[in-house]
């Protein structure tokens, strides 16, 4: 076997173990995220009350998915990275954060974990699954693709900048990533269901028999979003983005801004000193001008006497 090919399998047992835990983490994430959405729908149906308003429903779904990702990603962050998303895995592969074998194993684990999570939600609740990603009436397939592309790119960029990039805030990356998911849901959940994760759309679709005829939107859009997010990150790295705002991630208090009062006082003193210096320079220039004029007159008088000759 070629050495480069053999190197792909150097850590195969660790990759298999990580993929197994990624399967568990994905099922865990979607169990609580989708379970909360399913519970909301079941409560509206069982209570006989009018369904919650659109804004309440959007907020509830966004909160369920965002908090579920914060908790799940934080639990598995030190173990597998807490990806739970083949589109995130693909972006990490593109930027060198995942090796090819682990990428393939993670994608399999995430897709099967999504099926398992959706199956558990369906088995534990009495109502049919109401958590499938579907395009809202009036939303075209092209609009759905671009919405999914942009929100996936935002999620990818949050993972790359907060987790893949190492800095002092990296241990808290799951919070920022979860908030990004929450914000993206606020925008897109009405139009597309806000998948930004092909596994999240695939799992419930398998259990429900693929009720959305345009399910392909949730593969094409997130795939393009992975490319967009990874490309933007690569551009930032290539042009050394950290030079634009050096010491931003440091905790050294000496890098903090100086005392504003002292800075204001120093600036005022500088302006006063500059004004005094300009005044002194102006006076000196006037004195030199007066002396130069007097010397010129004396020189002219002397020249006149020297050049005078009687008739």
From Swiss-Prot:
Residue ranges of the TM segments: 17-37, 57-77, 79-99, 101-121, 144-164, 169-189, 216-236
Coiled coil: none
Induction cue: Shows similar high expression levels when grown between 15 and 33.5 degrees Celsius but a 50% reduction below 15 degrees Celsius.
Membrane topology, record value: Multi-pass membrane protein
Cytoplasmic side: 1-16, 78, 122-143, 190-215
Keywords for this protein: Glycoprotein, Membrane, Repeat, Transmembrane, Transmembrane helix, Transport
Annotated localization: Membrane
A GO cellular component entry from the record: plasma membrane
Protein's UniProt keywords contain Transmembrane: yes
Residue stretches of biased makeup (Polar residues): 299-311
UniProt keyword Repeat present: yes
Motif range (NPA 1): 85-87
UniProt free text on domains: Aquaporins contain two tandem repeats each containing three membrane-spanning domains and a pore-forming loop with the signature motif Asn-Pro-Ala (NPA). Lacbi1:392091 has NPN/NSA motifs which is in accordance with the fungal aquaporins (NPx and NxA).
PANTHER family recorded: AQUAPORIN TRANSPORTER, MIP17260P
Family that this chain belongs to: Belongs to the MIP/aquaporin (TC 1.A.8) family.
Protein name per Swiss-Prot or TrEMBL: Aquaporin Lacbi1:392091
Species the sequence originates in: Laccaria bicolor (strain S238N-H82 / ATCC MYA-4686)
């Amino acid at each position: 076997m070629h050495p480069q090919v053999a190197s792909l399998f150097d850590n195969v047992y660790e990759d298999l173990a990580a993929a197994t835990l990624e399967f568990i983490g994905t099922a865990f994430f979607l169990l609580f995220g989708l379970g909360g959405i399913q519970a909301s729908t079941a409560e509206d149906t069982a209570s006989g009350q009018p369904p919650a308003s659109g804004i309440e429903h959007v907020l509830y779904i966004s909160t369920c998915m965002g908090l579920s990702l914060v908790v799940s990603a934080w639990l598995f962050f030190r173990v597998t990275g807490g990806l739970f998303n083949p589109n995130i895995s693909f972006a990490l592969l593109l930027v060198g954060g995942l090796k090819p074998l682990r990428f393939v194993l993670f994608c399999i684990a995430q897709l099967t974990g999504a099926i398992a999570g959706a199956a558990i939600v369906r088995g534990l609740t009495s109502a049919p699954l109401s958590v499938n990603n579907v395009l809202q009436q009036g939303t075209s397939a092209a609009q759905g693709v671009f919405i999914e592309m942009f929100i996936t790119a935002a999620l990818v960029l949050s993972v790359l900048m907060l987790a893949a990039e190492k800095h002092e805030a990296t241990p808290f990356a799951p919070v920022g990533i979860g908030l990004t998911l929450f914000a993206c849901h606020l925008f897109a959940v009405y139009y597309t269901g806000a998948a930004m994760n092909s596994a999240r759309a695939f799992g419930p679709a398998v259990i429900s028999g693929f009720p959305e005829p345009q399910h392909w939107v949730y593969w094409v859009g997130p795939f393009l979003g992975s490319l967009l997010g990874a490309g933007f990150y690569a551009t930032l790295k290539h042009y050394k983005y950290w030079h634009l705002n050096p010491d931003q991630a440091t905790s050294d208090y000496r890098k903090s801004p100086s005392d504003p009062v002292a800075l204001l006082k120093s600036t005022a003193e500088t302006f006063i000193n500059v004004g005094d210096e300009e005044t002194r320079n102006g006076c000196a220039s006037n004195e030199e001008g007066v002396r130069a004029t007097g010397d010129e007159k004396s020189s002219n008088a002397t020249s006149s006497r020297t050049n005078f000759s009687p008739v």
